[in-house]
Each structure stands twice: as structure tokens, then as C-alpha cells.
Amino acid sequence: MSIRSLVEAYNALDRLDLRVLRLLEAAHVRREYIPYGLVVRWAGRDEGAVGRSLSKLNRLGLIQRIKGPYEGFRLTFNAYDVLALHTLRKSGKLVSISPTPIGVGKESVVYSGEIPSGVKAAVKFHRTGTSSFIRARKARAFLARRRHLTKLYEARLSAHAEFAALSAVFDGGGLVPEPIAVNRHVVVMRYIEGVDARRIRPEDALPTARDVVETVEVALENGIIHGDLSPYNILVGDRAYVIDWPQWIPASSPNSVEALSRDIARLEEFFSGFNISIDKDRLINIIVNNKYKQIDFNNVYEKVLRSFIKT
């Protein structure tokens, strides 16, 4: 469903519709399909009103209905989009969103938007999970009991992981998009005007390399390794910004040196075309000599788990 269609669906919802969606979302932590009787009971409204709301939500493509031993309902991913947009709007984090995407990838879709201050924002919808935290023991255990939540949970975890990395690197002075808000599987950040590094002019190569290495160093000192750094993830405008952080890994991970080396190798390959070298040893020594902040590997996971339970 396009954002235009999502916004139209959202504008058609009333308070009861939103209440039913939130009830179904909360109930999904324990079961895939929620029986009709439970929805009516939890909604606290007469059966006719709840039934009409469910039919409306089904017609809008926000829920799926099954009929078998019992009549039940589950949310679609479109509903999570709507709920995230609703929460961001009601909390004053997002005013508007573009009808067409400005970036489409395998793991996410990005739209431009506007926050209440009038500042242009990038609104990133995570669609699949790329976070290394998905492989954490607690995450695997959570999903093993809730297979129906896998796609949503992984997208949500990736969004929160990216927001955590952006916050740490931005606060440390690194050149990344300023994080504004995260809700469910959606991250709102300040929009960066620029082009990816593959399109820079030769005279911009050296300042670009310096900015990127500086940001990599800030991230390392905060215990973070990008994990997928390449010219595709560098936006060059007034400065060079490193974007796309959901797959970051802690510097304390057993494979941290290997992951950092891969990032540096891709930078070396690109900047060698401009006769620019990267001081690989200095960056790796930050890990080897433990000159970084220790990150609790499960902290991001725990926040996402709590958000599921409290939804």
C-alpha cells in the first residue's frame, strides 16, 4: 500500500477504529489471530459498533479476517504503518510525509517529511530485519515462541537499533543524520541534502574521506561499528554524512575487528581512486586497546521487547 493510500486510510479512522487496532497489536504478543469475542470484550463498546469497525478495518486493508473454528483477526503490516504515523503525529514528531518515496531498498523505504519546527525530515520505514541484535539469544528465544511476529519484530528491532546508533554517534559529534524520533518500525531523522559519495568531484574526495574517517572514529569510541560502510552509505553535501546504521555491531563483539576491517577495506578501495589512503591501524587499535565505551548488547533488545509488551 502506498503512503498516499495509508494516509487516506488513516484519515478515515475514528477513535474506536484506532482503539481496535491498538488492542489487536497488544494481543499479537501472545497470539496470531485474536478471536472476535475477545476484541468485543476488550474494546468496551457494544458488539454492533465493534463489528462495524472490524469490517471497516478489513475493507481498508489494515486487518485480516479468518473464519474457521472461530472468527479471528490479525493486523497487516499496513496497520503498523498507520499506527506508527498516528503516534508520531500525536506526539508532535511529524507533521507531514511525502506521497512518494525518496529511497527504496531491500530493507527499508524512505520518504521525506516535515517536523513541527518546519525542518525537513527523512522518514524511514524498516521492512525487514538487518540488525545484528536479531541474532542475540534473547531475541531468538522471543521469536521462537511467536513466529507470527518475526517480520514485524525484526523490522522494529532494526529501527530501534539504528536510532540508538544514530543517537550515540550524533551526540558524540559524528556526522550522521540527527535522530528525531523512533516509533515501532519507523525512524524520523533530519533530512540530509546531498549525493552519494560515488558522484563526488575529485576536489571533494579528501574532505569527504576526512569526514567519514572522523565519524567512523567517533562511532568506534562509542562502541559502534557500522558494519556495512561503503560509498552508497555516504551522503555528501556541505559535509560527508554516514547513513544507514541498522546493522551496526558493538565493538566488543568477537568479530568486531573483522567487521571493521571490511568497512575500512571498502573505504580504501573507493578512496584509492583519488590516491587517498586510510589509516587502518589507528582505527583498529581503538578496538584492540579497548579505547571505547562498553555497550550492553541486550539493551536495545530489552527496550524493543518492553515496547511490545506495553503497546
Model-identified regions with their sequence ranges:
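Short alpha-helical segments that sit at the start of domains
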Residues: M1-R22, A49
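Conserved ATP-binding subdomain of kinase catalytic cores across diverse folds
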Residues: R4-A9, G48-G51, L60, Q64-I66, ...
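Short amphipathic alpha-helical interface segments
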Residues: L13-W42
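Conserved kinase catalytic-core helix
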Residues: Y33-E47, T150-V176, A197-Y232, I264, ...
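Basic amphipathic alpha-helical segments that dock to polyanions
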Residues: V39, V50-G61, A219
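Minor-groove-contacting beta-hairpin "wing" of winged helix-turn-helix DNA-binding domains
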Residues: Y70-T76
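Active-site acidic catalytic loop and adjacent metal/ATP-binding pocket
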Residues: V104, S108-I115, V119-A122, D211-Q247
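C-lobe/activation-segment region of protein kinase-like
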Residues: L220-H226, D238-T311
